[in-house]
Amino acid sequence: MTTAALASEVAAQEIETKQDRLNALMDEHGWSAVLFSRHENIAWITAGRVEARVALGTETAVCSLLLTRQGRRFYIAPENEGPRLAAEEFSGLGFEPLLYPWTDNTTDVLAHKAGGPEIGADTAMPGFYHHNFTPLRAPLLSAEVDRLRQVAAAVTASTVRVLRTFTPGITEDEMAARISADLLTRHITPSVLLMGADERIFHYKHAVPRAGVLKNYGMLNLCARQHGLVISITRFIHFGPLPAVLAANFEKAARINAELLHATRAGATSADLYAVAAKGYAAAGVPDEIAKHHQGGACGYLERDWVALPDGTERVAPTQAFAWNPSLQGAKAEDTVLLRDGAIEILTATPDLPVIEISIGGKIYRSAGVYLP
């Protein structure tokens, strides 16, 4: 068996397992089929094999996937997309094409004809039952964990490699360009680029690249996607001695991060984790900081599947990815981690950069410090 054939067989097995989850959901709601149009769900159900983006900023793909309770699978697309989708995306995955002229989008008609009258959908469409499929994507399967680790390792390596190239005088736009180029040449797509220089890091939680020029302090904060899986990481660089106040803030952020990691256990709710963060900020003497930015949460096929909220009801799954991002006054801790077998694995660890270690309950949790070249 060729490598490509083996990969298709492994993907097909993963798809079958996920089809079982879909079948249970369809039985629960009385649906005859499910229609996926959102990127995260298309990537999930196709084992990360299908990249159906043309416009990078859209939430929906150039095709929709119809999966029936009887086990048939279709991709619905305009005729002009058909050849590429057949050759480069769906080959070997067991999906049948349903094509329409690009001048007349009949996705709804084709879906009902092939899937029946009662269809759940991940986008709001007349004649379909709109549903949030996020809970279906957890827990992660072993193959997904393997891919997540691979993507995280590549994104982390790019982050460290590019961070080390920053020097005083670099612009925020150039910072974004360098990390983007490094990722894209490895077939990894950046989805969030937050590059801050000096005072902008203190003023804005989401420092999108603007006219800033690095003097002493720089932030490289990104999310990047491959195989449908999204990795989040933030790292900082400082030229000259690190101010004591900033160093203290990184220690505080690292402690809040450690407390969140320690509390990230199967069954914990979004509200439980928000309370942990709130308590951490209060203990750090900055109780109001939690109101200035979200604290992160579960991730996987989106930058965040959900964030911790005071009244959040989502629950942590036994095998799930998370990206917490506690921050205060110029400092932030952010890594992508995996909860598996009751333990936390930091997927974006950077041991060659400064590390802050926090001990909680006999366990050591590590966050990144500031790189001082």
Regions picked out by a protein language model, each given a short descriptive name:
Residues 1-373:
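Active-site neighborhoods and metal-handling regions in enzymes and metal-associated proteins
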